[in-house]
């Protein structure tokens, strides 16, 4: 099932309506925005992957689609899912360049496993505070739930030995620092990392200062500049080859967000 913006607008809260309107009004892209359910997603792309993903934003040649698992009855959870994807769509519409798939296996693997997740986290750093402060939609609540689950169920099983293991720990640390604003839960994260991976925490804290400067700053060039800074810091510690860096980091983009 596909629904139009107007059909969805009639089902959502005034705050989410305002976010939806603002995310579309500044765009010159002629492609319409549609909303699809899980069945529509399966028909076009297959099953949601990973399975715990409840929503995603997909650009197509003739339209944009925000998929959520069900769109018949939009409740609080679905509203948060829509707000989350509107954040990504908004940055896309206002000039943050996408990263296209490549046939180079090493580059694509680097994007899928590290550079892509890092960019997503940094996009969250831009719009989580913006959406909460301007539209009173609190995406941090979901982040805090995931953080608590991470500390309890996932972190104990992660190792801190090889470089890939350290990078995974680093990504998770930054992710939950960005996606939660619960001081108690974050303090638990700090304590757990201090015991398990202090070396990773020290690097991540340095990266985090760069990432957190993005909060509510709607400027594509600034985003790219901050992303590049994180890669330079990472290169010092992990010697990540520049040839694997994402294309959007080096391409010129003058759009304002």
Give the location of each predicted region.
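Pan-zinc metallopeptidase signature
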Residues: 149-257
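Post-HEXXH active-site segment of zinc metalloproteases
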Residues: 76-77, 91-125
């Amino acid at each position: 099932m596909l629904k139009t913006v107007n059909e969805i607008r009639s089902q959502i809260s005034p705050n989410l309506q305002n976010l939806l309107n603002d995310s579309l009004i500044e765009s010159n892209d002629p492609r319409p925005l549609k909303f699809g359910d899980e069945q529509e997603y399966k028909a076009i792309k297959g099953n949601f992957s990973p399975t715990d993903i409840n929503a995603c934003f997909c650009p197509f040649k003739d339209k944009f689609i925000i998929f959520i698992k069900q769109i018949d009855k939009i409740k609080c959870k679905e509203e948060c899912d829509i707000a989350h994807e509107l954040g990504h769509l908004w940055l896309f519409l206002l000039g943050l360049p996408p990263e296209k798939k490549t046939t180079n296996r090493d580059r694509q693997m680097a994007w899928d496993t590290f550079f892509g997740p890092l960019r997503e986290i940094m996009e969250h750093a831009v719009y989580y505070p913006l959406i909460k402060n301007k539209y009173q939609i609190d995406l941090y609540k979901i982040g805090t739930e995931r953080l608590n689950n991470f500390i309890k169920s996932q972190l104990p099983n992660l190792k801190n030995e090889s470089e890939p293991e350290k990078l995974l720990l680093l990504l998770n640390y930054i992710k939950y620092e960005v996606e939660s604003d619960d001081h108690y839960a974050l303090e638990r994260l700090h304590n757990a990392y201090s015991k398990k991976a202090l070396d990773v925490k020290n690097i991540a804290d340095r990266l985090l200062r760069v990432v957190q400067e993005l909060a509510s700053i709607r400027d594509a060039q600034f985003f790219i500049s901050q992303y590049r800074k994180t890669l330079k810091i990472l290169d010092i510690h992990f010697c990540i080859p520049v040839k694997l860096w994402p294309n959007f980091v080096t391409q010129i983009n003058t759009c304002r967000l």
